[in-house]
A protein has these predicted regions:
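Interdomain hinge/linker segments and adjacent boundary elements that couple functional modules
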Residues: 3-120, 202, 206-225
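Amphipathic alpha-helical interface segments
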Residues: 73-105, 117-225
């Protein structure tokens, strides 16, 4: 006894389509029924666990160059959007050509936890230039640089991430860059970013924290060398 005869769903809609074609029906009617069956199967098909996920390397740079509104947060390192070439080399990223932070109508909001100012890749000799770069970009039109003080972190920052418009999110792991495009996931990361944004200080207060870190770097490097 077949599944069709017992009223149980078959796994492939083409099985039902073949039954329609075996009946002596008008060709147009067969195609109409087949179309309805395929639509019904599509609506009830289980969502793939990897739907809306991409592992293509370099996707973040491309997204950042095309997006009008970019939000980035890092917990323990300088956000990649703001890297200098020297910082990138010390971090083992090779040649680095980040997206332009200027452009009419483009907005960037970049947050970093206070500890990120003190994480030194390599010998740390890249840090004075990197911290100086943070001060420079914080004054660019269309760029908001925020520092989340250590004592007010709204939640444990498990990893850094970047949100591009309301279209995609990139997350970097030790082994790969993950791009998420599912609507719910992009919305969730947007809400998480808003929490860090509310906790961060901006403008002169943020620059004061960066300048404090720069003084610490100079003193420490002077002591080492």
């Amino acid at each position: 006894v077949s599944r069709v005869e017992t009223g149980r769903r078959v796994s492939d809609p083409e099985v039902v389509a073949r039954l329609f074609r075996a009946l002596e029906l008008d060709g147009a009617e067969v195609e109409r029924l087949v179309g309805l069956v395929r639509e019904a199967y599509a609506l009830t098909a289980p969502r793939r666990s990897d739907a809306g996920v991409s592992f293509r390397a370099g996707a973040g740079v491309e997204l950042a160059r095309g997006a009008r509104w970019v939000r980035a947060f890092e917990a323990v390192v300088v956000p990649r959007l703001l890297w200098t070439a020297e910082y990138a080399a010390a971090a083992g990223a090779g040649d680095w050509a980040g997206p332009s932070l200027e452009g009419e109508g483009r907005r960037f909001c970049v947050g970093v936890a206070e500890g990120g100012r003190r994480t030194w890749p390599g010998s740390g000799e890249c840090m004075p230039g990197q911290l100086g770069h943070l001060l420079e970009v914080s004054r660019l039109e269309g760029v908001r640089l925020g520092v989340v003080p250590a004592h007010v972190t709204p939640r444990v920052p498990l990893h850094g991430f970047t949100v591009y418009d309301d279209a995609a999110v990139t997350v970097e792991t030790f082994t790969r860059e993950i791009t998420l495009t599912g609507v719910d996931e992009v919305r969730a990361y947007g809400e998480i970013f808003e929490g860090f944004e509310r906790a961060a200080v901006f403008g002169d207060a943020a620059r004061a924290l960066v300048e404090d870190a720069a003084r610490e770097v100079r003193e420490t490097l002077g002591f080492i060398h």
